[in-house]
A protein has these predicted regions:
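N-terminal domain-onset segments
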Residues: 5, 20-84
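Bacterial N-terminal signal peptides
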Residues: 7-13
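Phenylalanine-focused residue identity feature
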Residues: 11, 39, 50-51, 69, ...
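Mature extracytoplasmic domains of secretory-pathway proteins
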Residues: 65-109
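Low-complexity intrinsically disordered segments
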Residues: 94-163
Length: 163
């Protein structure tokens, strides 16, 4: 599959541009998450779904949106996720990225209730060995998006560890 990158397509519309420098890894990842999450919300409200996509905090402090495309109209989400991860690893190895965010739609068991729910997952990785997946359980009814209890778990540390 050929990897193509679409950079700065959605977030420039949202007015996201430059990150503060010298912040702790968790703070930089939270800032990146806050930058990428609105696009998932927008797509869910508009289309009821979204393809996996991502964002990266560049070493320059700029935030870039990133999408994976292999030429197919509706590739499986796992294929898109793999393309995005390949690009993230390449950016990590080259030193271009200091943090990445992979956003995708999943079904999860909410820890507090034990019930299954749709959720927006945001997998965050930072070059300073910080990795977490944040889950935003949601319910979508008639275009209205309602969040449940947000929770997180340790991430896979699969982007920057691959150096």
């Amino acid at each position: 599959m050929k990897l193509r990158w679409l950079v700065a397509l959605g977030f420039s519309i949202l007015g996201i541009g430059r990150a503060e420098t010298l912040q702790p890894p968790k703070a930089e990842c939270e800032m990146l998450m806050n930058a990428v999450l609105p696009f998932a919300e927008q797509m869910l409200k508009k289309d009821g779904e979204f393809f996996p996509y991502g964002g990266a905090l560049k070493s320059t402090g700029k935030i870039a949106s990133i999408a994976g495309y292999d030429g197919r109209e509706r590739p499986p989400s796992t294929d898109v996720i793999n393309l995005l991860k390949q690009g993230f690893v390449a950016g990590a190895k080259s030193g271009e990225f200091k943090a990445t965010a992979l956003v995708y739609d999943v079904r999860v068991v909410v820890p507090s209730s034990g019930k299954k729910s749709d959720a927006i997952a945001v997998a965050l990785n930072h070059r300073s060995n910080y990795s977490v997946i944040v889950y935003y359980p949601y319910e979508l009814k008639m275009g209205v998006l309602t969040y449940g209890e947000v929770f997180a778990q340790k991430g896979e540390s699969d982007i920057f560890a691959a150096k």
